Amino acid sequence: MGLAGGARVVLFVVAAAAAAALTAAADQIFTSSGAPFGRNSREPRYHVEFHPVDAPFNPENGQESVPMTSHVGKHYTCFLPVEETKTMKSIIPQNATNVIIESERRVKPKDPDELLEILKDQCFYRHEGWWSYEFCYYGKIRQVHVEGEKVIQEYVLGEYDADATDAYYENQTSDSADEDDNLIDTSKRYHVHLYTNGTVCDLTDMPRETEVRFVCSEPTVVISSIKEISSCKYVLTVQSPMLCKNPLFQQEKRTLSIHCNELLAEAEATVDDDSLPKEAQIIIPDPDGLHNYAAYAT
């Protein structure tokens, strides 16, 4: 969607997003008519991040950009969440406090393994005190202790087991998820891969094994936790933004980021607010006034 033809659409998305994101500063976000935007409890949560000139956000290909102005006159180029720009069809301002969003026609979502395929041949790391962990998608999980550049201790916590993973889903019951305080009532919100045949455990004389849980979470892929739930049996949780594209794994209110790059003074001179519809000229709070506040809609 081009800015000329879709400025009203995109800027009203940002307005709704900003009103939802900056809860404490919502009264500082206005249309050019001076009326504030209301918040819709059904909308996703938004987090607005401001980036200085010397450390700009690098947008993805096709990510929609929107010119914005702070209340002290600073100019920014703000980038909408990619998912939002792909799913919003039209936004019609009914009045100064309401926005109606018409969704694109429904498209059958990809299954989890299709979405996670992008992780193939990639490895991710986590450090926890004495131990460091390496998780390789469709590969191995290692637990190591390193001193300098030398590995002092190493255990393999499992290798990807396609057969065991298939059997897990064939035999899955409501009791299949471990009673984990962080995952209660979310048994349908993570996708499991099983890693088996790791280093033999001294306590059980059985190979170590790990259940890898992929959860919907933005903005990047990261190992969020690893726990030993019983002797030499582990649960490793991986935050996976690509999984959020499947509605089954979406939280009730997802958190999406709007990134705003500050413009150089010479670039600011090229921003012509008069070229935009008056109702689309939006004033946002200056980041200095937010004190790095990252607010979310309640």
Swiss-Prot record:
InterPro entries (alphabetical): Man6P_isomerase_rcpt-bd_dom_sf (IPR009011), MRH_dom (IPR044865), OS-9-like (IPR045149), OS9-like_dom (IPR012913)
Which gene is transcribed and translated to give this protein?
OS9
- State if rRNA-binding is listed as a keyword: no
Instruction: Kindly give the SUPFAM superfamilies that the UniProt entry links to this protein.
Output: Mannose 6-phosphate receptor domain
| Ranges where the MRH domain occurs | 121-246
Q: Where in the cell is it found?
A: Endoplasmic reticulum
Q: What is this protein called?
A: Protein OS-9 homolog
Q: Which domain of life is it from?
A: Eukaryota
Q: What does the record give under GO molecular function?
A: carbohydrate binding
**Job of this protein:** Lectin which functions in endoplasmic reticulum (ER) quality control and ER-associated degradation (ERAD). May bind terminally misfolded non-glycosylated proteins as well as improperly folded glycoproteins, retain them in the ER, and possibly transfer them to the ubiquitination machinery and promote their degradation.
Gene source species: Oryza sativa subsp. japonica
Per the UniProt entry, the disulfide pairs are C123-C136, C201-C232, C216-C244
Q: Which residues bind a mannooligosaccharide derivative?
A: W130, W131, Q143, D202, R208, E228, Y234
What's the family? Belongs to the OS-9 family.
